[in-house]
UniProtKB/Swiss-Prot annotation:
Catalytic activity: UDP-alpha-D-glucuronate + NAD(+) = UDP-beta-L-threo-pentopyranos-4-ulose + CO2 + NADH; UDP-4-amino-4-deoxy-beta-L-arabinose + (6R)-10-formyltetrahydrofolate = UDP-4-deoxy-4-formamido-beta-L-arabinose + (6S)-5,6,7,8-tetrahydrofolate + H(+)
Residues covered by region (Dehydrogenase ArnADH): 314-660
Listed name of the protein: Bifunctional polymyxin resistance protein ArnA
Annotated site residue numbers, Transition state stabilizer: 102
Organism for this UniProt entry: Escherichia coli O17:K52:H18 (strain UMN026 / ExPEC)
PANTHER family linked: BIFUNCTIONAL POLYMYXIN RESISTANCE PROTEIN ARNA (PTHR43245), UDP-D-APIOSE_UDP-D-XYLOSE SYNTHASE 2 (PTHR43245:SF13)
Annotated positions binding NAD(+): 347, 368-369
Coiled coil: none
Residues binding UDP-alpha-D-glucuronate: 393, 398, 432-433, 460, 492, 526-535, 613
Described purpose of this protein according to its UniProt entry: Bifunctional enzyme that catalyzes the oxidative decarboxylation of UDP-glucuronic acid (UDP-GlcUA) to UDP-4-keto-arabinose (UDP-Ara4O) and the addition of a formyl group to UDP-4-amino-4-deoxy-L-arabinose (UDP-L-Ara4N) to form UDP-L-4-formamido-arabinose (UDP-L-Ara4FN). The modified arabinose is attached to lipid A and is required for resistance to polymyxin and cationic antimicrobial peptides.
Residues annotated as catalytic: 104 (proton donor), 434 (proton acceptor), 619 (proton donor)
Pathway where this protein functions: Nucleotide-sugar biosynthesis; UDP-4-deoxy-4-formamido-beta-L-arabinose biosynthesis; UDP-4-deoxy-4-formamido-beta-L-arabinose from UDP-alpha-D-glucuronate: step 1/3; Nucleotide-sugar biosynthesis; UDP-4-deoxy-4-formamido-beta-L-arabinose biosynthesis; UDP-4-deoxy-4-formamido-beta-L-arabinose from UDP-alpha-D-glucuronate: step 3/3; Bacterial outer membrane biogenesis; lipopolysaccharide biosynthesis
EC identifiers of the protein: 2.1.2.13, 1.1.1.305
Length: 660
């Protein structure tokens, strides 16, 4: 049976050996070049392929159409993936009549995603296993073909568990590969309600937070012990690594991070104490705990910290351009709630941020980004993170002022992007759900959905294509010049301070603000083309929490990622939004101050937006990247958002001349 194999690591080597032993004909093997920054303790798939006389390739992007075509020419009957690190596109998966199968190092549907071996140890699991499953477009979600369970012993560390998983994988493949070859397999669908998903781990994820229980920290040590990078902490600015540890449940009470004793080296935790059995100071040699204490100059009562002492004193400087806008002012509030951010902001007004102007860690300048270029360049250079939130993002302006949209949204932002490249600063760029345009996918996916817009004579797409081109420019700068970036795509965020009623009076506002103005003034609610267009509305608090986690960037998981931020469960048509808003309005305690409801009125989009407008029937996000990179889920129901948004705007209305 002819197969094409995607493989890496020890699991890749044993998978190839198992296929050959089962009589499969391997036409080609796709693998990865080794990362020089990664400790290669595992077998080489490339070397094994060469020794076996099998063609082997390591393309940067195996999903490129040229590689898809080359794989198609190999006419594989079945495809296998053994610890290949990139998602394989659906076009490749569909090439094999018998399907594609992946070996995953957990008991699916638990621990989908990356580094399951390390995550099960971090989380203190007592059981894991290996799963062979059918590959589908969504990672690790296909039907299960075979599973083998293994126990995790209390003294297991990452490398011993790795060896157990390899042994189990050999057994599983020996039992299952002949059945696949003869088309004699039983597949069991995964239970989605039991699925968990985890993202990539980096060395920075393994710092020891002493306020946590000793058992949690011990599990961290087990999960990243040699040959992984190790768990670490600091004495002042001196980093040290913990290679092995032991939990003491009944240690004397002390402040977390305090040294209880040096022989043995015992550190107080949030619950219990952690004995450092072996460790390493800086880039030195491994030594026992008592010697490590001596090397680090520790005595009873010394304090350890989770980050360098100098780093702990310096706040992260965040530059927000457009700080007075809807996202900018809510994000400022979230950042200032913590004690480790310094926020620098620029905008043409300050009404929404007036509550922060006296905050010691908020620095505001009133100005226009097209004029204050020197100030902007200086602050890009000065700050750590840059968020250029300035944009014209109201649909009526796309047809009314397309050139102004292009000049501000594209040209001014491109200049800021180039400053970030010049000074090597991290940029978090607000893309938009508009870039998906008229995509027909059920869920708009950051990595796979096509971005489809209308013809040139429809100027409403100038905003979408301006943002899309900036996305592509940022991506290219990341690939070619090492720009550290994250693109985020908001899906219809709503909440207090979204636009204002004066903007709605001239038609330059988002949908809910316009609808609220209609209710306040007693004018008919206009349903553009019947209001059947569906959107997924997201509470600003949910959106800002996701954006805050992007700024935090735990373990650098957001670097180089595109992340939809939306609530796929809060889908409603504009007509349904209007009905929900009306119901909330009729129950509001200030209702009697406003005129009677004037009804709904259906209008054509051309009469409202002008010629050159096209609408989009649906726009629902896939949020798998947000789940993977941010451990984030939207929580707030749409009705709650509507109630709070309406209440905010009604309380801004001058009621002195309103009927009571």
């Amino acid at each position: 049976m002819k197969t094409v194999v995607f493989a890496y690591h020890d699991m890749g080597c044993l998978g190839i050996e198992a296929l050959l032993a089962a009589g499969y004909e391997i036409s080609a093997i796709f693998t990865h070049t080794d990362n020089p920054g990664e400790k290669a303790f595992y077998g080489s798939v490339a070397r094994l392929a060469a020794e076996r006389g099998i063609p082997v390739y390591a393309p940067d992007n195996v999903n490129h159409p040229l590689w898809v075509e080359r794989i198609a020419q190999l006419s594989p009957e079945v495809i296998f993936s053994f610890y290949y690190r990139h998602l394989i596109c659906d076009e490749i998966l569909q090439l094999a009549p018998a399907g594609a199968f992946n070996l995953h190092g957990s008991l699916l549907p638990k621990y989908r995603g990356r580094a399951p071996l390390n995550w099960v140890l971090v989380n203190g699991e007592t059981e894991t296993g290996v799963t062979l499953h059918r590959m589908v477009k969504r990672a690790d979600a296909g039907a299960i073909v075979a599973q083998l369970r293994i126990a995790i012993a209390p003294d297991d560390i990452a490398i011993t568990l790795h060896h157990k998983l390899c042994h189990a994988a050999r057994q599983l493949l020996e039992q299952t590969l002949p059945a696949i070859k003869h088309g004699n397999i039983l597949e069991i669908a995964q239970r989605e309600n039991e699925a968990t998903c985890f993202g990539r781990r980096t060395p920075e994820d393994s710092f020891l937070e002493w306020h946590k229980p000793a058992s949690v920290l011990h599990n961290m040590v087990r999960a990243v012990a040699d040959p992984w990078p190790g768990a670490f902490s600091y004495v002042g600015n001196q980093k040290f690594t913990v290679w092995s540890s032991r939990v003491h449940s009944h240690a004397p009470a002390a402040q977390p991070g305090s040294v209880i004793s040096v022989a043995p080296l015992l550190i107080a935790c949030g619950d219990g104490a952690l004995e450092i059995v072996t460790g390493q100071a800086g880039d030195g040699i491994t030594m026992q705990g008592s010697q490590l204490a001596q090397t680090l100059g520790l005595v009873q009562g010394s304090r350890l910290n989770s980050q360098p002492a100098c780093a702990a004193r310096r706040r992260t400087r965040v530059l927000i351009l457009g700080v007075n806008g809807f996202i900018g002012n809510h994000l400022t509030e979230r950042l200032l709630r913590e004690d480790h951010y310094e926020v620098y902001g620029l905008d043409i007004g300050s009404d929404a941020i007036s509550r922060f102007l006296n905050h010691p860690h908020f620095h505001f300048v009133e100005g226009d980004i097209s004029i204050h270029s020197e100030w902007i360049e200086y602050h890009v250079k000065k700050c750590d993170v840059v968020l250029p939130l300035v944009a014209i993002a109201t649909p009526i302006e796309y047809t009314r002022n397309p050139l102004r949209v292009f000049e501000l949204d594209f040209e001014e932002n491109l200049r800021i992007i180039r400053y970030c490249v010049k000074y090597r600063k991290r940029i978090i760029f607000p893309s938009t759900s508009e870039v998906y345009g008229m995509c027909s996918d059920k869920y708009f996916d950051e990595d796979h959905s096509n971005l489809i817009v209308g013809p040139v004579n429809k100027p409403r797409w100038i905003y979408s294509v301006s943002k899309q081109l900036l996305d592509r420019v940022i991506w290219a700068y990341g690939e070619k010049e090492g720009l550290q970036f994250t693109l985020f795509r908001p899906f219809n965020w709503m909440g207090p301070r979204l636009d204002n009623l004066n903007a709605a009076r001239i038609g330059s506002s988002r949908a809910i603000t316009q609808l609220i103005l209609n209710l306040v003034e007693g004018s008919p609610i206009k349903l553009i083309d019947g209001g059947k267009q569906k959107r997924c509305f997201t509470d600003i608090r949910d959106g800002i929490e996701a954006l805050y986690r992007i700024i935090e960037n735990a373990g650098n998981r957001c670097d180089g990622e595109i992340i939809n931020i939306g609530n796929p469960d809060n889908e409603a048509s504009i007509e349904e939004l209007g009905e929900m808003l009306l119901a909330s309005f009729e129950k509001h305690p200030l209702r009697h101050h406003f005129p009677p409801f004037a009804g709904f009125r259906v209008v054509e989009s051309s009469s409202y937006y002008g010629k050159g407008y096209q609408d989009v029937e649906h726009r629902k996000p896939s949020i798998r990247n947000a789940r993977r990179c941010l451990d984030w889920e939207p929580k707030i129901d749409m009705q709650e958002t509507i109630d709070e948004t309406l209440d905010f705007f009604l309380r801004t209305v001058d009621l002195t001349d309103k009927p009571s």
